[in-house]
């Protein structure tokens, strides 16, 4: 499938927009390909020419609603992840995430996306530490999510500066210096 073809781009865009709208209304696990196709006026066979399943479409939505990984400072991402997150995420992804907070299917794809996002950020970076990039990405993403869940579960409202400070206290971020 030629992703540069105007028809392909339009079809993908309408499916992404339809999924975004659906995610603001109902849990991802309840969204069906059939309903998406009916709303988007796209044949199911056409959907499956472009996407393996609805999780594949969701992954594309995440790509559209996040800044390119090459625009993100790795040093800042490691030292101040909670200050970087608002720079990475575009509207309406934050609202969608809040709405989907309790949907395990959504959250699994969300975490997987951000794991891969961090891996892209770290692709051309050499760290002074011997910690594998895959482990670093996995740990940073999952701990970042844990901080947000901690706030939600305990009904706390901690500002990003304090969250960054907690993060730095809990993890030896100095050991993750980027080699220049």
Short names for language-model regions:
Residues 32-33, 62-74:
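Short, basic, alpha-helical segments at the C-terminal edge of helix-turn-helix-like DNA-binding modules
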Residues 71-102:
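Hydrophobic alpha-helical connector segments
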Residues 153-180:
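C-terminal peripheral helix-coil segments that are non-catalytic and often amphipathic
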Residues 15, 34-39, 47:
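Append "Primarily bacterial transcriptional regulators
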Residues 102-148, 172-175:
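Amphipathic alpha-helical packing segments from all-alpha helical-bundle domains
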Residues 2-3, 23-28, 41-59:
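HTH DNA-binding helix-turn interface
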Residues 2, 24-26, 39, 128, ...:
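Cytosolic nucleotide-binding catalytic cores of signal-transduction proteins
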Residues 1-26:
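Basic, helix-initiating cap at the start of DNA-binding domains
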């Amino acid at each position: 499938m030629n992703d540069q073809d105007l028809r392909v781009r339009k079809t993908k865009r309408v499916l992404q927009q339809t999924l975004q709208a659906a995610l603001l209304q109902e849990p991802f696990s309840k969204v069906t390909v059939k309903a998406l196709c009916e709303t988007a006026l796209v044949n199911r066979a056409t959907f499956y020419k472009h996407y393996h399943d609805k999780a594949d479409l969701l992954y594309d939505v995440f790509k559209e609603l996040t800044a390119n990984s090459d625009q993100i400072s790795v040093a800042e991402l490691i030292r101040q992840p909670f200050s970087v997150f608002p720079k990475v995420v575009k509207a309406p992804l934050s609202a969608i995430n809040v709405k989907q907070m309790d949907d395990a299917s959504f959250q699994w794809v969300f975490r997987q996306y951000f794991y891969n996002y961090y891996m892209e950020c770290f692709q051309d970076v050499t760290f002074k530490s011997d910690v594998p990039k895959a482990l670093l990405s996995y740990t940073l993403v999952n701990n970042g999510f844990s901080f947000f869940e901690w706030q939600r579960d305990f009904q706390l409202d901690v500002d990003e500066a304090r969250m960054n400070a907690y993060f730095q206290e809990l993890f030896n971020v100095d050991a993750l210096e980027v080699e220049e």
